[in-house]
C-alpha cells in the first residue's frame, strides 16, 4: 500500500497526524473507537498514543468529554458515551503521541454499513 492510502479499515474516517494515520469510528449509539496505523497503514498498537479523548459537541447540549480505554486486544481505544445524532454534531479528537499533544475537530460522520 502507498503512503496515500486513506481507505478506512474499520468503517470510520481516516485522518493523519505527522506520518501516522488514525481512524475514527463514531457510532450514533455512543460506542466509539480509534485505531492507529503507521505511514504505510500497518496496524500500530493502541498504546502508541496516550491520553486519548473525544469531546462530543451536540446542538443545544453541554459538551461530553469521553476518556478512552485500550481494548482487551490492545488494538484500539474505545469510548462509551451518550447516543448522538450526526446532524450538527462535531467531535474533538485529542491524544498524545511521542510527548506531543494533538487535537482536531471533526464532523460526526456515521460509519458506512
Regions found by a protein language model. Give the residues of each.
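Intrinsically disordered, low-complexity terminal tails/loops enriched in metal-binding residues
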Residues: 1-113
Amino acid at each position: 500500500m502507498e503512503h496515500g492510502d486513506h481507505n478506512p479499515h474499520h468503517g470510520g474516517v481516516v485522518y493523519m497526524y505527522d506520518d501516522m494515520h488514525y481512524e475514527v469510528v463514531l457510532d450514533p449509539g455512543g460506542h466509539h473507537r480509534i485505531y492507529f496505523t503507521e505511514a504505510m497503514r500497518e496496524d500500530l498498537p493502541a498504546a502508541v498514543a496516550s491520553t486519548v479523548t473525544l469531546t462530543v459537541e451536540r446542538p443545544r447540549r453541554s459538551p461530553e468529554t469521553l476518556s478512552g480505554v485500550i481494548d482487551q486486544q490492545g488494538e484500539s481505544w474505545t469510548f462509551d458515551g451518550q447516543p448522538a445524532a450526526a446532524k450538527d454534531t462535531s467531535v474533538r479528537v485529542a491524544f498524545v503521541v511521542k510527548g506531543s499533544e494533538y487535537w482536531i475537530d471533526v464532523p460526526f460522520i456515521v460509519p458506512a454499513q
